[in-house]
Amino acid sequence: MERTKDKRLEELFESGVPVYSISRLDCINRCLAEAYETYINNNRGESNIYALCGSKVHDVLEGIVNGENTETDLLPAVEKELEEAEMLGYEFPKMPDGSDGIRTKWVNDMQHFCATYKSPNPKNLSTEKLFIYKSPKGNVLQGYIDLQKKNEDGSIDIYDYKTSSLYTGSNIKEHGRQLVVYQMGLEQAGETVRSVSWIFLKYVEIRFMGKKTVKSKEKTEISKVVERCKIGYEMAKYVEQVMIEQGFDEVDIDVALTEFKQSNSFSVLPESVSIEFKMLPYVCKYEVTDEVKQECEEYIDKTIEMWESLGDDESNYPPLKFTKIQKNGKEVSDIFYCTKLCSHGKTCKYLHDYLDKLDNGTKDEFDDLF
C-alpha cells in the first residue's frame, strides 16, 4: 500500500542528510556488489516469489486492521499473487531431487494461515508506523513498523510479520536488529516499548494439557510450536492419547488420525477432542537488553562508516563469497542466495564469471534459474 509523505523525512532529504534503513545496512554487509548495484547505480533489479507473495500478505493484513479488507480477502489475494508471479516466471527453488517440495510446503503453510486467520481487535492497533532513529554518531535510519499496539498503561508492543521460516543460530541476532531499531526509534520519540516480537505466519503455537515426560505423574500445560503443514503429523500422538483417554475405540481413532494428518485441522476431530487443543498465532518475542542495543548501535555506525569510505570505484565493492567450507574441510558452492533471492542474480557479472569456471553439474543448476 502507498505510504503518505512525512514532513520529518522530507526535511531530512531536503537538508541532504543521508537516511538509511536496516535492510540497506544488511545488504551492505551481505554483498557489497549487490549494494553497489542497488544503492549507487539505483538499480532495484528483479524481485523474487517470496518477496512478491510476502508483500501481498502484509498488504492484506494491514488492510484488515485498517478496515479496508476482511479475513476472507486473504486467501484469494495470496492465490492470485502466486498465480500471477508464476505466470511471469518467478519460481520457488527446487528440492535437490528436482521436485516442488519447497513450493508445496510454502503454499500449504500459507493456505492454512489464510483459512484460519482471525483478525485482532483493531482497537489501539496501528500499522506501518514511521520511525526515525539517530545513532550515537548521528547516523539516521528510518523504517515502518508492521503492527503496533498501544497498551492501557501507554506502553507499546511492536510486531513484525514474517512469512519466512523460523530464525535460528546467528540469524536470530541478525534479524533481531530490525526489531531493536524499531524499539530504539520509538524510544527516541518518547515512547515506552514493552515488547518487540515477530509473528511467524507459517507456524502456530498449540497449547494443551498433557504429561511432559513418560515419568510425569500429573498433566501440565504443554506448548508446541509447529509448522502449519505439519500439524497433523506433529500432533497426532497427542490427539491419539486424548482419544484413548476418552474411550474411543481403535478403529475410530485410526480414521480420525488419518483425516487429521491429511487436513492439518483440529476441526475434523470429535468436538470433545478438538476442544482440548488451543491453536494460536506464533508470536516470538525478542529480548532487547542494553547489550543488544549497544551491539546494534555499533553495527549501524560501523557499517555506515565503512560504506561511506568506499567512494565511487566499483572495484571497492566485491561480491560475497560463492563458496563455503563444510565441516569435513571440503569447499563447496554456496550460491543459493545469489541464484534464488538476490535481485541482481540474473545480471551479476561476478556470478556469471564464477559459474563459467564450474563443471557442468553446477552449471546446470544455474541454467535452471534462467
Regions found by a protein language model. Give the residues of each.
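RecB-family 4Fe-4S metal-dependent nuclease core
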Residues: 1-370
